[in-house]
Amino acid sequence: MKDLLKFLKAQTKTEEFDAIKIALASPDMIRSWSFGEVKKPETINYRTFKPERDGLFCARIFGPVKDYECLCGKYKRLKHRGVICEKCGVEVTQTKVRRERMGHIELASPTAHIWFLKSLPSRIGLLLDMPLRDIERVLYFESYVVIEGGMTNLERQQILTEEQYLDALEEFGDEFDAKMGAEAIQALLKSMDLEQECEQLREELNETNSETKRKKLTKRIKLLEAFVQSGNKPEWMILTVLPVLPPDLRPLVPLDGGRFATSDLNDLYRRVINRNNRLKRLLDLAAPDIIVRNEKRMLQEAVDALLDNGRRGRAITGSNKRPLKSLADMIKGKQGRFRQNLLGKRVDYSGRSVITVGPYLRLHQCGLPKKMALELFKPFIYGKLELRGLATTIKAAKKMVEREEAVVWDILDEVIREHPVLLNRAPTLHRLGIQAFEPVLIEGKAIQLHPLVCAAYNADFDGDQMAVHVPLTLEAQLEARALMMSTNNILSPANGEPIIVPSQDVVLGLYYMTRDCVNAKGEGMVLTGPKEAERLYRSGLASLHARVKVRITEYEKDANGELVAKTSLKDTTVGRAILWMIVPKGLPYSIVNQALGKKAISKMLNTCYRILGLKPTVIFADQIMYTGFAYAARSGASVGIDDMVIPEKKHEIISEAEAEVAEIQEQFQSGLVTAGERYNKVIDIWAAANDRVSKAMMDNLQTETVINRDGQEEKQVSFNSIYMMADSGARGSAAQIRQLAGMRGLMAKPDGSIIETPITANFREGLNVLQYFISTHGARKGLADTALKTANSGYLTRRLVDVAQDLVVTEDDCGTHEGIMMTPVIEGGDVKEPLRDRVLGRVTAEDVLKPGTADILVPRNTLLHEQWCDLLEENSVDAVKVRSVVSCDTDFGVCAHCYGRDLARGHIINKGEAIGVIAAQSIGEPGTQLTMRTFHIGGAASRAAAESSIQVKNKGSIKLSNVKSVVNSSGKLVITSRNTELKLIDEFGRTKESYKVPYGAVLAKGDGEQVAGGETVANWDPHTMPVITEVSGFVRFTDMIDGQTITRQTDELTGLSSLVVLDSAERTAGGKDLRPALKIVDAQGNDVLIPGTDMPAQYFLPGKAIVQLEDGVQISSGDTLARIPQESGGTKDITGGLPRVADLFEARRPKEPAILAEISGIVSFGKETKGKRRLVITPVDGSDPYEEMIPKWRQLNVFEGERVERGDVISDGPEAPHDILRLRGVHAVTRYIVNEVQDVYRLQGVKINDKHIEVIVRQMLRKATIVNAGSSDFLEGEQVEYSRVKIANRELEANGKVGATYSRDLLGITKASLATESFISAASFQETTRVLTEAAVAGKRDELRGLKENVIVGRLIPAGTGYAYHQDRMRRRAAGEAPAAPQVTAEDASASLAELLNAGLGGSDNE
């Protein structure tokens, strides 16, 4: 019995490991894996179909073909286990060893491993410091390489051609050693002394100054050190033994008709073996050198093709002209091992079918067809049948189920009760794409889905299919019930708002039910309560819309959370009173006492969840749905062609527009306007006409005139079906109704320009042929766009998930005081996002003080929930510093306080939550709703861009921030600073509006003054940039020489003359070095100093500046000295939508980025070159000045002698995120990326919480470059994981040593994914070959920290419910305990053994 137990133990053994290391395999290692050498290229015998001995499928090397049976048939059965047959040499064991036993081929000549040769940068090339071309010429036998120079003048590693080699031989004889082929490279690698080489390189590194050399040296040092530390030997990159894959992983299967299907690898191996055997024979025969050389080259090519076909030269093709799939192709790409089999597997116990509506289901139920349920729950049914004694064996149970006996259905009912199933709809874009439901057995073959979960699945019933999965184990069922049940996923993880929101019919039903109508039947009655209202409605005595008074009892929570009743008479309608019956206690009546649209219903559910919690909300949602369906049916809302009412004014408006267009056409023909102006004007006219038509149409649809009780006419909101659908938010929008009943309007050509004749017809009137033809482009483009968008959006999601997959909440509080300042998002005159929406669910980083006092309003480390936010709003706080994942100090992962509220649950986040994946899904899921296009700014839009004044909308007081200004002669303020902001503060101290004020703007009101709504507070000339004097005095020209640096121009119309400064390109040789400037002097001719400095007021003028003053005139501060014409920005395309989001997350540099000041100091201009200006910034403290060359065509925002701060904009343009990080720090770049991404999503009306974007930014910032190594082991200029630097520095500081200094790096998401510490994760993402090559050479360890790595090695993930398992494992490892192995008792063992033997004896068990 003991050995039986041993045998079973061997089978249940689980491998415990903490990390996976990858390294180069030495020849001895390859031989130790191998079970024998493959000597022949044969596969199987064509007659017997048995594997050939010593061939690629040899049973002696790889194991038996049949379980427990040797090849010749001498030994069969279990009792001979482990015997090696003396006749055929095959060990008697299970067949599955053919999946794990490897063989090997002894190569007659060494060959280079193509990955280390050709995958850039070439590792062999870097190690030997030889160019790749030279190494290839040596390897493929074109030239010689010197291995030992000896006493000759030949250098080691010198390349010799055939002729040079022969000459050298004649000259030196045997003094030197030169070879060709892989042997040569192997000899060079063998003779390297890595440590000595390292020392030498480090010395060199200290001596050199050139940047390129330093980079190259650092690369080599890193590679050499990696070799030294990992214990890899460089010569192992040259193969002398080739491992052979186990045969069952490269199968040869007989097809019917006597042909065979084989894996491509077999062909590739055959080539290698053939060439290798031929080479051996040639060497034994001592064949001529040239033949041997050719054979060696062919062997090298064969091995290359086996390892990575097509990497060098042309890919080897099979019989059908398609390239053969090599080992490298097996693991990379979507069809490779990683993505096809390790990360995505097919699932047993699953089925799929079409979905239909289940309007009578409860929220936690789904309808499952009986047929499907029977198939999916088979094992449970068999078990129950056997348990009840209804079937003696599993086989009998199987028969019963196949016959579908009556008792089977009863058992099925029992099995299914309380056993949730998972429903999934592809594409699963976020975690709500898989939810758990309790199955309800139904007839038919379609799965029934609850209508309210359609939004989460993005499902509709036009033929969508869904998959069903059965959680088998108890843990899985528990997880499904507790975490994945649809009732537990009411809120969306992306924004924390309800996702179980009624739509379409339900919304229409509720809207119809809560509308009121003038003079409806039963108006003016007073009812005792909702019950009576329903009775009257049902008996036809009152209309649903009748305005009545009803006695309503409301329940409100008091301070202790007890419900208190309050009864009063309310003015309402019958329908609203009936709806009140389903509203849970604790909500105010006011929430149903309005016409309920989709937004109102969503708000109602949200309020219910926040006040009453989960269970009442779920019940309420269900009730809303049933009621909505019922009343939608009763409403009888239908759409007829007469519902699309065309306004009478339409004809008139269109003829007016046509008249205007004709007029402009005449002006154009008489030459008063240019072609471009005419086009823009025509388009403006038609756009305006379209708006007028649609306004007339909406006014017409919106209201109808009725007779009230007193017999007078009264207007009321219309009951037109189309209008009701749009108004309630059930379906359709104003823009769509406009096309039905207004006019279709302007259409675009395929090149994006707008066609100037619009479609004046609408769909009700019908389009004529020309109009229909014009419409086709837009319609088709829409379809093509959608297909592209889906692919792009999916790829963006994949990159986001990959970069963030290992970010998990790992501790409660990291204790940091860092955080980011949150202010409301204000653009121009309106608040885009109020502060409460931004800080809700975040944790405060500092105490929030009551404005104007030192009282603490909210203490530090408070989770801001709804009540706290109300408090902040009451006290009109407009900036709060909150914790953020970007500033979290946790080493691997983040802490719960820095993340804040779990949006989908409404409380602070739990440890182990996979926030990275949630963030990636939340950003990626709405990707398909974003647009794909870059917007061309056409006519109307580009003119609006040149603003020239600020007009406030509300009344309040003005607040200016970072402002420098002077008062001009008329007493107005003139701005002389660059990034001034003007805010409008209301009487509560809240910021209502915010504007940027440019340099040179004249303010009508000063700081702190009161303004009325609609008042203009600042204006400026948008087309020129002024030069403004800060002092008063007299103008003195310097270097302004007519004809050399300036030229005088006279305006024909006004007769005024002005001076124009010449660009340096237009000046004569004498004027090149002159610097035209205006100096301000006092009456005595002395320099006037700029206030607060000791610098004379002197204003240098750039080229093209226009001066309208004469020498010596008197001026006062705030006057304009000169104007610099601004070239209008022209029509720059705005990249919008998905491409913009991708650009931001990939941290791509914009084409012409803004130029920012690298240091703070005084600006001056140095010597110019042909196309560039030299900008010099001299720091005030006298340290080294900073110089930068700027192209001449860039417009500068600064003048000579002006002071700039580090990070200020010197030349306008889109800012590059890397510059923002370098000059303004981590928080600034976070704010920039978050705001830019949010702008794109906000435009589409998609809400995403900021913290998701911050999570991705944290991952983009996870690398740092070492600036100064201090006492650490890092290299200068090396890029290291930020957490590694932090840990190393903490250790160094604890020992009183100097830590390393570093600068944070911003990586794009693709780069960041590939630069992750885990090579398994990186390899499964992209560029598999490169990642694995790099990892192998460095001998990397993968600590299996992320989710992906653990999925790949087949473990629970260290997040969610797997988090505890991993924590426990870590604890055990630390304590040195043995892991809890599955225990096997003797009884179990003998039982399972008996079963095993039965299986072996019983023959075929599967009739």
Curated annotation (Swiss-Prot):
Changing Q504P: Resistant to antibiotics salinamide A and B. Its cofactor is Mg(2+); Zn(2+). It holds the Pfam family RNA_pol_Rpb1_1. Co-administration of salinamide and rifampicin or salinamide and myxopyronin suppresses the emergence of resistance to both antibiotics. It catalyses: RNA(n) + a ribonucleoside 5'-triphosphate = RNA(n+1) + diphosphate. Changing A735T: Resistant to antibiotics salinamide A and B. Changing S775A: Resistant to antibiotics salinamide A and B. One of its GO terms (cellular component) is cytosol. Binds 1 Mg(2+) ion per subunit. Binds 2 Zn(2+) ions per subunit. Mg(2+) binds at D460, D462, D464. Zn(2+) 2 binds at C814, C888, C895, C898. Changing G782 to A/C: Resistant to antibiotics salinamide A and B. One of its GO terms (biological process) is bacterial-type flagellum-dependent cell motility. One of its GO terms (molecular function) is zinc ion binding. InterPro entries: DNA-dir_RpoC_beta_prime (IPR045867), DNA-dir_RpoC_beta_prime_bact (IPR012754), RNA_pol_asu (IPR000722), RNA_pol_N (IPR006592), RNA_pol_Rpb1_1 (IPR007080), RNA_pol_Rpb1_3 (IPR007066), RNA_pol_Rpb1_3_sf (IPR042102), RNA_pol_Rpb1_4 (IPR007083). Zn(2+) 1 binds at C70, C72, C85, C88. SMART domains: RPOLA_N. The modification N6-acetyllysine is found at K983. Changing A748E: Resistant to antibiotics salinamide A and B. Changing P758 to S/T: Resistant to antibiotics salinamide A and B. Keywords: Acetylation, Antibiotic resistance, DNA-directed RNA polymerase, Magnesium, Metal-binding, Nucleotidyltransferase, Transcription, Transferase, Zinc. Gene3D superfamilies: 1.10.132.30, 1.10.150.390, 1.10.1790.20, 1.10.40.90, 2.40.40.20, 2.40.50.100, RNA polymerase II, clamp domain, RNA polymerase Rpb1, domain 3. This is DNA-directed RNA polymerase subunit beta'.
